[in-house]
């Protein structure tokens, strides 16, 4: 499954547009991991443990979107967009959404 943020793929022809596809995942804050991440990762200016969780959430959302496109008969998703939004009463969870247009390329 080809995923692209662009509306076209150079050298390929779109023969079928299947429609909008999306995938979502929500990750919750872990108090203990947050505490240890702040101690361990602040020194370098980046939080490696947070980055890994975000990467996994992004990959899960993209995988769900790709599977939805595959079930429609598509072999690519164009115009892919990733959105990150805090949800929950105190913003304690993060929702990652991937969306795009499922197409068939030749």
From Swiss-Prot:
This is UPF0145 protein BF0226. InterPro entries: UPF0145_dom_sf, UPF0145_YbjQ-like. Belongs to the UPF0145 family. PANTHER family: UPF0145 PROTEIN YBJQ. Disulfide bonds: none annotated. It comes from Bacteroides fragilis (strain ATCC 25285 / DSM 2151 / CCUG 4856 / JCM 11019 / LMG 10263 / NCTC 9343 / Onslow / VPI 2553 / EN-2). The lineage of its organism: Bacteria, Pseudomonadati, Bacteroidota, Bacteroidia, Bacteroidales. Pfam families: YbjQ_1.
């Amino acid at each position: 499954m080809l995923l692209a943020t662009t509306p076209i793929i150079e050298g390929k022809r779109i023969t079928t547009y299947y429609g909008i596809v999306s995938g979502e995942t929500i990750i919750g804050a872990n108090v203990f991991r947050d505490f240890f991440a702040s101690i361990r990762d602040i020194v370098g200016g980046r939080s490696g443990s947070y980055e890994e969780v975000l990467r996994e959430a992004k990959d899960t959302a993209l995988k769900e979107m790709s599977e939805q496109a595959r079930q429609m008969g598509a072999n690519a998703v164009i115009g892919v967009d990733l959105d990150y939004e805090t949800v929950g009463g105190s913003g304690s969870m993060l929702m990652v959404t991937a969306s795009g247009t499922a197409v068939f390329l030749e």
